Amino acid sequence: MIFDVKAPILGFETIHKMHLQKIDEIFLRLNSAEDNSVVSFTLVNPFALRKYEFEVPTPLKILLELEGAKSVLVANIMVVQTPIELSTVNYLAPLIFNLDKQLMGQVVLDSKKYPHYHLRENILSHTHE
């Protein structure tokens, strides 16, 4: 599914279209959908790994047309390592997808408001919660 990027991924502000592909119930692949770009991210379903909740800022709700949206997906960027147990997840800057309207964006959470989320957390750090 191709998404219009309404709130860019930090460091990738020039990418305006992304292709999201589900791998399984936990992992997804996000690739640039533009001819001049070869950007790819591995994403993870945070709810499969830990208790995870945050408030979406109003400006992002408006940009992504989340009011009344029936299908919203939250995913986090993962840095894959070998072995997989060394991989890290960015819980402080989730990606939000409006599946109904094919809109997406990244929100950077306030670390003071969410001190229990970090930019690089080991993928296994919350598996026993």
From Swiss-Prot:
GO biological processes: bacterial-type flagellum assembly; regulation of translation
Disulfide bridge map: none
Swiss-Prot/TrEMBL keywords: Bacterial flagellum biogenesis, Chaperone, Cytoplasm, Translation regulation
A GO CC annotation given for this chain: cytoplasm
Keyword Cytoplasm annotated: yes
InterPro entries in UniProt: Flagellar_assembly_factor_FliW (IPR003775), Flagellar_assmbl_FliW_dom_sf (IPR024046)
Localisation per UniProt entry: Cytoplasm
Pfam families in UniProt: FliW (PF02623)
Subunit record text: Interacts with translational regulator CsrA and flagellin(s).
Annotated family: Belongs to the FliW family.
NCBIfam families, A to Z: PRK13282.1
Protein name, per record: Flagellar assembly factor FliW 2
Protein's organism: Helicobacter pylori (strain J99 / ATCC 700824) (Campylobacter pylori J99)
